[in-house]
């Protein structure tokens, strides 16, 4: 039991803001944000997204390598709407194919809000995990810096997708409605 209590815990976070100018139909943005499955599918890779019910999704985050370990995060995402806003947050998380880590916790709190000129949003992504035994010789600060860099990369990828795909999807939705 002693070894379990001596595990080194690592924690890292990343934050991104987004400001999207919408040229046409800005008044329809609040209604568009109510289309949860459509909006979440435009923000994330729809090939890795599985609807679980109203306001609930499973998402297989793009896998990545950290010091020769293949990391495959899988998260359950909750989605809520409030006035002119859509919020996404992680309700559950685990790592597929990495039995070495049993205390992985991924957090996400992302909000996208309809404004007069378009959409504004912010996402905070965080991870808390014990230092895997295979990586015990690597200084924790180096692991945390690497983890923070990976999270920033994930958020930048999502931001790029949102900037490109969300406006296209919104315009398509406007044509359909």
What are these regions (language model features)?
Residues 2-67:
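Hydrophobic ligand-binding cavity/cleft-lining segments
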Residues 9-15, 54, 72, 103-105, ...:
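A general secondary-structure signal for short beta-strands and their flanking turns/coil
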Residues 19-23, 62-64, 80, 113-115, ...:
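Solvent-exposed residues in well-ordered beta-strands and their adjoining turns
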Residues 29-30, 77, 123:
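Hydrophobic pocket/interface hotspot
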Residues 55-64, 89-95, 125-126:
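Generic short beta-strand segments
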Residues 71-118:
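Hydrophobic-ligand binding "helix-grip"
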Residues 99-148:
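Beta-strand/loop substructures that line and gate deep hydrophobic ligand-binding cavities in soluble
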Residues 136-177:
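A conserved amphipathic terminal alpha-helix motif
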């Amino acid at each position: 039991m002693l070894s379990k209590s001596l595990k080194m815990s690592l924690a890292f976070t990343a934050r991104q803001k987004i400001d999207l100018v919408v040229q046409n139909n800005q008044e329809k943005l609040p209604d568009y944000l109510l289309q949860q499955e459509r909006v979440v599918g435009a923000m994330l890779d729809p090939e890795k997204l599985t609807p679980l019910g109203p306001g609930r999704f499973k998402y297989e985050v793009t896998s990545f390598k950290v010091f020769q370990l293949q990391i495959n995060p899988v998260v359950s995402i909750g989605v809520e709407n409030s006035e002119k806003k859509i919020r996404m947050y992680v309700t559950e998380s685990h790592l597929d194919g990495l039995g070495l880590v049993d205390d992985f916790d991924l957090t996400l709190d992302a909000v996208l809000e309809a404004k007069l000129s378009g959409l504004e949003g912010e996402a905070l992504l965080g991870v808390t995990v014990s230092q895997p035994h295979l990586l015990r010789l690597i200084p924790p600060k180096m692991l945390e810096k690497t983890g923070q860099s990976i999270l920033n990369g994930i958020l930048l990828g999502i931001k790029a997708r949102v900037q490109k795909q969300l406006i296209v999807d919104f315009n398509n939705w406007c044509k359909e409605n």
